[in-house]
């Protein structure tokens, strides 16, 4: 079985990164699956947690941080170009690997990853309740920015609803939250 994880990077020492690395290591070492980690912008930054040598890490070289050197509206144009580059490079890798499953999060680019073509089932993991996707890290940043944040969250939610085959949540409460408007099977997993 071939499994591809897609994420921006595994450079932060956070809970999501730890869970992803633990799962990839388990699937590769214990269950002997072929596991790939596709990162968009890992670059030369080391992976934040020990990654099994059996997990194949491929960085796609899409530097999303480069869009922040521009002011709006050019920044939006650059962001769209980077999304297209991510889709193009990830699709090339998916075409070469032919995975059975593609795994990503609801928070990072489900609207792009959902468009990848192939026979792979798409599993999206939610590490927060659906309601919290519309809250930016900086909280209120002005009316226009708040509207944009809500639009972005709605786009992600619609992508999850449209493209994912299975949605995985961390708690039963999160599963209930996501169930509103989703027809996909929703699994609730408690990570220990």
Predicted regions, residues:
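N-terminal strand-loop element at the rim of the active site
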Residues: 7-13, 26, 30-76, 174-179
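Short His-centered aromatic/hydrophobic patch
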Residues: 104-109, 126
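Conserved small/polar residues in nucleotide/adenosyl-binding loops
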Residues: 191-192
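Conserved alpha-helical elements of sugar-nucleotide-dependent glycosyltransferases
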Residues: 15-23
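Active-site proximal beta-strand in glycosyltransferases
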Residues: 101, 116-137
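Membrane-proximal helix-turn-helix segments that form the acceptor-binding/catalytic region
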Residues: 89-93, 146-167
């Amino acid at each position: 079985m071939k499994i591809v994880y897609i994420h921006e990077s595994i450079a932060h020492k956070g809970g999501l990164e730890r869970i992803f690395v633990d799962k990839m290591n388990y699937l590769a070492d214990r269950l002997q699956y072929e596991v790939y980690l596709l990162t968009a912008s890992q670059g030369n930054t080391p992976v934040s947690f020990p990654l099994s040598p059996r997990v194949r890490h491929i960085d796609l070289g899409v530097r999303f941080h480069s869009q922040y050197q521009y002011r709006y509206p050019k920044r939006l144009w650059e962001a769209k170009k980077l999304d297209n580059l991510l889709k193009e490079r990830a699709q090339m890798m998916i075409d070469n690997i032919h995975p059975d499953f593609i795994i990503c999060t609801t928070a990072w680019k489900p609207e792009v990853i959902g468009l990848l073509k192939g026979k792979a089932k798409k599993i999206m993991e939610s590490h927060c309740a659906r309601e919290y996707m519309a809250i930016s890290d900086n909280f209120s940043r002005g009316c226009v920015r708040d509207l944009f944040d809500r639009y972005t969250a709605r786009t992600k939610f619609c992508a999850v609803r449209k493209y994912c085959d299975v949605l995985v949540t961390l708690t039963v409460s999160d599963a209930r939250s996501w169930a509103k408007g989703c027809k996909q099977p929703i699994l609730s997993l408690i990570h220990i």
